[in-house]
Curated annotation (Swiss-Prot):
Keywords: Cytoplasm, Endonuclease, Hydrolase, Metal-binding, Nuclease, Ribosome biogenesis, rRNA processing, Zinc. Single strand-specific metallo-endoribonuclease involved in late-stage 70S ribosome quality control and in maturation of the 3' terminus of the 16S rRNA. This is Endoribonuclease YbeY. Zn(2+) binds at residues 146, 150, 156. Its EC number is 3.1.-.-. Residues 1-11, 19-29 have a biased composition (Acidic residues).
């Protein structure tokens, strides 16, 4: 789900654990270099120390996101509990339930950098993985790739053709990362 908001409208998502992670990738931008990923990872108040240890680490998140970015990006990935997930979904989408991933796309900076926050609701992600018979790691990877594509303008809710394009990209990126098709 993509939410278009102005950067000044959402101060709760300050980029606080930031350092670049522009490693090798198959995609190069117009200047002939790999897109750079500036990544911060945050945890909501409901995410305790024990749960943090079980979540994907920053390096792994960067490895999953890098093949899904097509230009320089500045992402904050925030892991939240059910209460924060529900509050955000209600505030920005007027839906009174927590959803698996929300993408807050702030658009492109003048220098062409795509800026977005990807918010993952841990209890929802865990429940879906169990119900769908997926590993938790594969489901987190899928939702991060999904959110990254939303941040760059892909939208499965615009119609069948757009949905098919986004789904095909997700399947291809996840296959390159060694994950199975998430839609089977």
């Amino acid at each position: 789900m993509t939410v278009e908001v102005g950067a000044d409208e959402n101060p709760d998502f300050a980029h606080d654990e930031t350092d670049g992670a522009g490693d090798e990738s198959d995609d190069e931008d117009a200047q002939g270099r790999d897109p750079e990923l500036d990544l911060a990872v945050q945890y909501g108040d409901e995410i305790g120390d024990a749960q943090r240890k079980s979540l994907p680490k920053r390096k792994v998140i960067a490895e999953w996101l890098e093949p899904a970015i097509f230009s320089d990006t500045q992402f904050t990935v925030r892991f939240v509990g059910a209460d924060e997930g529900r509050a955000l979904n209600h505030s920005y989408r007027h839906k009174d339930y927590a959803t698996n991933v929300l993408t807050f796309a702030y658009g492109e900076e003048p220098d062409g950098v795509t800026v977005a926050d990807l918010v993952l609701c841990c209890p929802v992600v865990e429940k879906e993985a169990r119900e769908q018979g997926k590993t938790l790691v594969a489901h987190y990877a899928h939702l991060l790739v999904h959110g990254a594509l939303h941040a760059q303008g892909y939208d499965h809710e615009r119609g069948e053709e757009d949905a098919a394009e986004m789904e095909a990209l997700e399947i291809d990126i996840l296959a390159k990362l060694g994950f199975p098709n998430p839609y089977r």
